[in-house]
């Protein structure tokens, strides 16, 4: 049987309002650190930093 893939589903949480706005996948072998992206938050109505949560 084939091994389970290295990709895992993560959630991105706004650092200002703490809402989980985005869901994405990441390869834990290529990116072992926590993902941090600047994305639009519809609750804050502006671009904020979103950090990875599980």
From Swiss-Prot:
<dbReference type="InterPro" id="IPR018264">
    <property type="entry name" value="Ribosomal_bL33_CS"/>
</dbReference>
<dbReference type="GO" id="GO:1990904">
    <property type="term" value="C:ribonucleoprotein complex"/>
</dbReference>
<keyword id="KW-0687">Ribonucleoprotein</keyword>
<keyword id="KW-0689">Ribosomal protein</keyword>
<comment type="similarity">
    <text>Belongs to the bacterial ribosomal protein bL33 family.</text>
</comment>
<dbReference type="InterPro" id="IPR038584">
    <property type="entry name" value="Ribosomal_bL33_sf"/>
</dbReference>
<dbReference type="GO" id="GO:0005737">
    <property type="term" value="C:cytoplasm"/>
</dbReference>
<dbReference type="GO" id="GO:0005840">
    <property type="term" value="C:ribosome"/>
</dbReference>
<dbReference type="GO" id="GO:0006412">
    <property type="term" value="P:translation"/>
</dbReference>
<dbReference type="GO" id="GO:0003735">
    <property type="term" value="F:structural constituent of ribosome"/>
</dbReference>
<protein>
    <recommendedName>
        <fullName>Large ribosomal subunit protein bL33</fullName>
    </recommendedName>
</protein>
<dbReference type="InterPro" id="IPR001705">
    <property type="entry name" value="Ribosomal_bL33"/>
</dbReference>
<dbReference type="Pfam" id="PF00471">
    <property type="entry name" value="Ribosomal_L33"/>
</dbReference>
<dbReference type="InterPro" id="IPR011332">
    <property type="entry name" value="Ribosomal_zn-bd"/>
</dbReference>
